[in-house]
């Protein structure tokens, strides 16, 4: 039996996790630190050291060890969590992938990726603006991708626009606070721009791809109804494609109505669509009343179906943000719960921990996971990680901190 963990399922899990921090019956998460002593490798036989720490193991015994080694923990706020995607930075002369609805292992992207969400179909600029690549095919009678060639984009409008030979969609700008907190060398946070999302139309056809430019076609601008399952599909009230033929070949998709093929009317409700260029299906006017054959031979255009909700409706879903960044900062001793005089080697997250000796879920902003001993009198001093033994019971403990 063949099975697949879909992108939608991964995204659902990530969204459920982030939502669990702020929903009405929210879970309580703490980030913990632990293990003040060096890695010795004695327990698992790996020979691990602080220089070459061991790979964490997913076992019952290791879970108990992690609890036993905990030193302190800090509550994770909902503002400490965000969905994220692999970081892709804009750079001129770089070939980015373009958005398409049908990538697979049998139909890979220009970079060789077998899925949309593992491709390079979006990028971030130096001003933290994030754009989706709608087309990477330059204008003219072209069907192949090319490198971006132009200045860094700055547009923040809701319409598609052309720059550097690419057709782009502005998605959102990473806020200064989120950039400081969540932007890393490998990942970048995802936000939703309310203006962009409000302008999106579910099932609108927003892009095309010329797969065969044809030969000997009659120059001019033509219009064709986009067939499919959209509202009023196949009629002048549905989605309509604009086909520009120059030098007897179909021009690539773009946003310039006079020189590029594109979308005259986007329509709505499409989950599949086709364009028929045969005689009787193309027209010289955008009301589709005067038939005009394109002539020649060949010529083919694919309809690219937009994501559910339309481009820009939901950046988290559209960009495949099934990764999550958690950023909680330990700052000093924090109410004397966080150690300041020793080191640690384990970092992790625990959900709904209870207060010691009860079944009540902890709510304090910081908690300590160590016992405290107060001596009536002390001779000498203790050192971090020193092993101490109680003479009467032979109980053994390790010193994490000592305050004289």
For the regions a language model picked out, list residue spans one by one.
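Conserved, function-critical positions that sit in or immediately flank catalytic
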Residues: 161-404
